[in-house]
Amino acid sequence: VLPTPFDEQYDIDLGVMHEMVSRIVDNGLTFGKGVIKISSAVGEGPMLSDNEWPVLLKRAVDAASGNAPVMLGIHYKDTKRSIDDAKRAQDLGAVGLQIDLPFMHHSNQDDLVRFYSAISDQIEIGIMIYNTHWFCQNPVAEYLNADTMLRLKDAEHVTAIKWAVPDGEDYDTMKRFSDTFNVIDNSGQHVRCFKNGGVGYISSLIPVYPAHDLEVLDLLENGKYEEAKAKEDLVNEALAEWMTKSHAKSG
């Protein structure tokens, strides 16, 4: 996950974006080792205008120079506009899309199937579902559950889900579909996810120190779960005081 850099006038700083992408690619985040995700929630995606995110995506794709996959976050738009943005991102070189739940519509499970299937039918790149239950009015009723994920197996371009579940729901239900879809942990339970058949996790530390997460990923992929957890804990403990102060200043 990459943040979106801005200059002192709060305009996107494309030069810094280029440097950031080039740096993490040069430090080993390449095909098979991760995906560069821009315009996500951490990347201020919901706040970017329809004139801003395309130039940001183009710069990231250019900086990756074909050495790493780049995906784009699409946020809480209706089906038609999501399809329009998806096609535009595809033309600009994105290999995939992270697409939020349509939570502004208080969707039921049938709505979710229709929404993601409709987008899948119109594009040729992958879709990772962003299971944003914390934005839903009724998280348990409106998050995309395991039964619904299985209903999407025929949606050709739905390939992955960022997995997290509301309080009281069973995280381990991902085992029912982890042999069909790529499951990416989005709840800080990386070891649990990999034990359940998951293949990745989200990290906001990549822009700062790619080597750490590349090493953790290698350990997880090789079943060295205790070592992976120890490395994560070491870094998390070192950052804990700063994180507390940072969150106190701004959510």
What are these regions (language model features)?
Residues 122, 132-247:
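Catalytic alpha/beta core domains of metabolic enzymes, predominantly
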